[in-house]
Amino acid sequence: MKNLSFLINRRKENTSDSNVYPGKAKSHEPSWIEMDDQTKKDGLDIVHVEFSPDTRAPSDSNKVITEIFDATEDAKEADESERGMPLATALNTYPKAAAWSLLVSTTLIMEGYDTAILGAFYALPIFQRKFGSQNDKTGEWEISASWQIGLTLCYMAGEIVGLQLTGPSVDLVGNRYTLIIALFFLAAFTFILYFCNSLGMIAVGQALCGMPWGCFQCLTVSYASEICPLALRYYLTTYSNLCWLFGQLFAAGIMKNSQKKYADSELGYKLPFALQWILPVPLALGIFFAPESPWWLVKKGRFDEARRSLRRTLSGKGPEKEILVTLEVDKIKVTIDKEKRLTSKEGSYSDCFEDKINRRRTRITCLCWAGQATCGSILIGYSTYFYEKAGVSTEMSFTFSIIQYCLGICATFLSWWASKYFGRYDLYAFGLAFQTIVFFIIGGLGCSSTHGSKMGSGSLLMAVAFFYNLGIAPVVFCLVSEMPSSRLRTKTIILARNTYNVVSIICSVLILYQLNSKKWNWGAKSGFFWGVLCFCTLIWAVVDLPETAGKTFVEINELFKLGVSARKFKSTKVDPFVVKTPLKTSLITTPREISKLPLQRNSNVSHHL
């Protein structure tokens, strides 16, 4: 935090100033602060300060005004400091916050793992013979398209239910305990998958496991965005994508081993299910000791607990650390208080659509996450099955999948470097543009039946995975945490993720019909379809997706309130803490300047929080 010594001195000055009037009466001290009814109705951020003869003790009146103005000034200082904080300083100041965020996000490894093994099972010989049927034309064993669709629908339906349960659970017990409960249920539901003897049991197990996965999808992103400063926000929210990839890579390695050693044994599919018991217990213990989100605590009015939570995320000791805590709590208070004027007291799902501002924020968040499905990423999840249907051998299909996930991990790390030079929108849009081109090439190669074209289409799907994990895949986790207001963040993310799940269900059904030999049997020619859909997603991003890189939450709030267009978000500068007065035409940016005004009896000062 910059200028800590200055802030310490200012605090001391404020303390001494409060004792200037030990017993003397001031005739024109501010006696109350009010917001008129029309201002409240219009949702304007204007606080009306009336100056009139004070009937209360002068020192009490002065203290009230000083506290209100100091809170706003503290919020401004915290916001400016966060915006200008270098990455190295952020890591040095918030190392514990980064560590706690990484721990919570690790829960997504399990979702990435299980969803990947489900798609890989369709290419596993023992699974095909145990639960599938033989194709009369080709003689091959495979899981019917209807069952593939059913299993996919089950876990996605479970995720939708889990996401909806997450909202009230977080409101009731907070982020930490909600995650711990979800981990407990995941460990319990895994028994159903391990002891499965029919596709029906797998369907039930997938549906039940989907509920805790839905919880992980929402809370990992919101927790990372709320516990860390702006300089770390991109890295720690996009780490969620890395966790997905780690889980998928782990699954690909396990499935390749199963294909080699347990191709004719039930351990080929039981062992991958059993490995899901590794993480829940250690993760639950770690999350139990993690600090709660200070934003959630402030929303609940638990300010002392919010301060304790912030102390646990900061390094160092002494007055500097306490000032950091005070400034951050004041900033959170001011941000939430501003949002309360536009929404209901508690914040409900209906608030996400109540007014034009929140409707826009909700729409962008939902479509942004849905873009992860419409860009063709679901095809990457069925990569092993795709490679096999494109004519690649089963063993080579599993090898391609491992290479694909390794490329995805490298691409996500590369996106961290690229984020220093390009914005969120840039990475999102450029990634879609490259994916569109590659998908059309894959479709063209699918029109040929030569061995070279089959290997080429498989190789290019790895290129799609690379560009996807360089652009849209990681940046979405950051964008969906920045677009909603702080009071509605969890609920908006839940709506957005459920939008993604619904769109993913549709895309998964289409993919399974496109690849299954008993249905459309498109094979690599399906690249044409996903190229067109990816291009449509790109057009939406150009028109509607704002650039939020380098913007703090309070700045983003102000830009949305002003109705700034998507392409002007980056260049528009706002000061959410500016103070205006009708006595002067200039803008007053600190409460300290208010004391210098030649205030007269019954004069007004409008303070723009």
From Swiss-Prot:
List membrane-spanning regions.
107-127, 143-163, 179-199, 201-221, 235-255, 271-291, 364-384, 398-418, 427-447, 460-480, 493-513, 526-546
Membrane topology (Cytoplasmic)? 1-106, 164-178, 222-234, 292-363, 419-426, 481-492, 547-609
Extracellular side: which ranges? 128-142, 200, 256-270, 385-397, 448-459, 514-525
By its UniProt entry, which PROSITE patterns does this protein fall under?
MFS, SUGAR_TRANSPORT_2
SUPFAM superfamilies referenced in this protein's UniProt entry, alphabetically: MFS general substrate transporter (SSF103473)
Q: Where's it mainly located?
A: membrane
Q: Which Pfam families match?
A: Sugar_tr (PF00083)
Q: Which UniProt keywords apply?
A: Cell membrane, Maltose metabolism, Membrane, Sugar transport, Transmembrane, Transmembrane helix, Transport
Family to which the UniProt record says this protein belongs: Belongs to the major facilitator superfamily. Sugar transporter (TC 2.A.1.1) family.
Summarizing the function annotation, the protein's role is:
High-affinity uptake of maltose and maltotriose. Also transports alpha-methylglucoside, glucose and turanose but not melezitose or trehalose.
The protein depicted here goes by the name Alpha-glucosides permease MPH2
